[in-house]
Amino acid sequence: MPNRFLADPDPTTAWARAAVEGKLFPVGELVRHAAERHLRDIRDGERRGIFWRPEEAAHALGFLPAVFQVTDGPAAGQPFYPLEWHTFVVGSLFGWRTATNRWRFRHGWLETGNGQAKSPLMGAIGVYIMGCCENPRAQCYAIGEDKATANVQ
């Protein structure tokens, strides 16, 4: 299924609006709160020293299909376009900045069911952080239920 939010000039914010409105897909309480926070912080975050940079979010989102391919299943060999929920995760991690232009979020935690492309997403985020963010000595860690799960990255 194509990601309907990537065509929007600010796909992360478009996803957040859709999540809050609840018209396109169901979300849990914590996800809705995160989407509400995103929209609220766009409105008044600058007073608290946080800034939304949609171009930074778009750069990270564009990195995934430009560099990575699907490696398994019927879509093998095709560009790895982020799933719709990836749009909010990746955009939030890389689009929010502090007054000193550092990332607002320095840690991320993802939990979701099987088949949601967590491993490819986390691998892509790790490569992006280590190679494309001008962050010397960048470190990325992936954890899993056990060593075999963590090694999938």
What residue spans do the PLM features occupy?
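Phosphate/NTP-binding elements of NTP-utilizing enzymes
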Residues: 2-153
